[in-house]
Amino acid sequence: MAKYKRVVLKLSGEALAGEQGYGIDPEVIQSIASQIKEIVELDVEVAVVVGGGNIWRGMAGSAKGMDRATADYMGMLATVMNSLALQDSLENLDVQSRVQTSIEMRQVAEPYIRRRAIRHLEKKRVVIFAAGTGNPYFSTDTTAALRAAEIEAEVILMAKNKVDGVYNAEPSVDVNAKKYTSISYLDVLKEGLAVMDSTASSLCMDNNIPLIVFSIMEEGNIKKAVLGEEIGTVVRGSN
């Protein structure tokens, strides 16, 4: 039986690119859709927030002289492309889903309306939140934290493609990097650990929303996280 009834799954854009590193890998997105279907079948209400880093990064554009707000809006549009691709993969598996965007584009998706999103979840539809918060200067991690608070999700599942949890140093650089099984948001902020940005961490901490950081690369990990099995790192309001 699932430990959580309502979850927000945070997917990085890079996770959708697979080994090619750019764009959308159809096999990878199909695998993720299959894993989402597994937890929907456990009667879990699933909302998804997708990043856009596989197509465009606002910070990268800004660093090269582009207006930051313009670069961020481009990033939001990239998340819409990813969200539509994920919706298509879910529908191919007969999983009902809805894309809701923070920036209105009614021809392709619903506008974000909190009560409607909750109603979709109650009807066991997967709701994919796209276009970030709709505001520049906010990351999709912050979107995940904000939407989790709004829909009263019990946990955020942060699926990573390069690490399998939270470490005290970059494991790809430091062979002695130590993985935490659990850590508090306060310690994450104090130590400047690269889990999510400080705005997102603070929002989760203030609203007491736990976070499970794990690897998306191993199939079945989303289900393990939902079942409450020991996986990755759990970040809580207090340890």
Curated annotation (Swiss-Prot):
Task: Name a biological process GO annotation.
Answer: 'de novo' CTP biosynthetic process
Q: Name one GO cellular component term.
A: cytoplasm
Where does this one sit in the cell?
A: Cytoplasm
Q: Which UniProt key words apply to this protein?
A: Allosteric enzyme, ATP-binding, Cytoplasm, Kinase, Nucleotide-binding, Pyrimidine biosynthesis, Transferase
In this chain, ATP is annotated as bound at 10-13, 53, 57, 161, 167, 170
What pathway does this protein act in?
Pyrimidine metabolism; CTP biosynthesis via de novo pathway; UDP from UMP (UMPK route): step 1/1
Role of this protein: Catalyzes the reversible phosphorylation of UMP to UDP.
The protein's assembly and partners: Homohexamer.
Question: Entry's NCBIfam families?
Answer: pyrH_bact
Q: What is this protein called?
A: Uridylate kinase
Write the gene name.
pyrH
